[in-house]
Amino acid sequence: MKVTMKISTALAAGWLALAGTAAVADEQSCATVKMADPGWSDIAATNALASVVLEGMGYRPKIDTLAVPIIYGGLKDGQVDVFLGNWMPAQQGFHDKFVATGDVVQYAKNLDGTEFTLAVPDYVYDAGVKDFADLDKHADKFGKKIYGIGSGAPANLSLAEIIKKDEFGLGDWKLVESSEQAMLTEVNRNVKKKSFVVFLGWTPHPMNVQIKLKYLTGGEKYFGSTGTVHTLTRKGYAESCPNTGKLFSNLVFTQEMENGIMADVANNKKTNAQAAQAWLKANPQQLEKWLDGVKTLDGKDALAAVKAKL
């Protein structure tokens, strides 16, 4: 394992070094950029930002909605080129299985300061549920249920392990798996009734504005404290498509940026593409950083092309 880790790190370093040089025009085989969306609002926002830029450069982004395990398998098999949603340490198990073995490349860090753990409404927190260890003390009020996201999501796997090991006395609790939106619908239903509910929460996400929530302590063993989000690519992507490789090495987001786009979608009934385009029109200086050393598909100035498209 140590040997493969070193090889993977060396290869990734080589590709990043390649991405750090002036990009050259990509071959037509790179024109379609295959990306993945696990059905999360934040990744829908970042995919939209990347897509607006790629389209302005003359590329064709293709985004498939897939479960996280399928995304990793797709990256390994070359069916997915890029995934912007490698949340760490939440996806440590997938990292160990795919990235550490060299089958998938952890290409660049695109977001800092994330939080991902169990959350409760503020009135539940004020009632004394402030830590994972407090949950079972109020088991009857919660109905012994924890609301998670889609089946196969790394956070769900962590919660399932907690239940299996009877950590925090949660051995007889049930994990309710559903889509992100279905989970939040259930949370909002409980909030309206001031009922007890515990669910997966994370930043960035509009839920932090729409729901008065608090994050529980005590789950750091499984969820870490603050985290990061990384861009993954299929093995060899930056070598075969160095121009888009350079773009994806430049793509760094902020909490404010992502929250702004997600809020625009939620509050103004815009599509992610419309919200991303509006954000870039209002913040054109961001394009200068993202398109530094990047060309259009046919080798022209990408910054001028994307601005003209906007």
Q: Each predicted region: which residue ranges?
A:
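Pocket-flanking alpha-helical
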Residues: 47, 64-102, 182-186, 205-212
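Ligand-binding pocket segment of bilobal, Venus flytrap-like solute-binding proteins
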Residues: 80-84, 154-221
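A conserved helix-loop-strand patch within extracytoplasmic ligand-binding domains
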Residues: 102-152
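Ligand-binding cleft/hinge of the Venus flytrap
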Residues: 50-57, 139-173, 281
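Short, well-ordered beta-strand elements
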Residues: 27-42, 59-64, 143-147, 248
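Immediate post-signal peptide segment of exported/extracytoplasmic ligand-binding proteins
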Residues: 24-34, 55, 137-143, 288-290, ...
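C-terminal functional modules
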Residues: 255-310
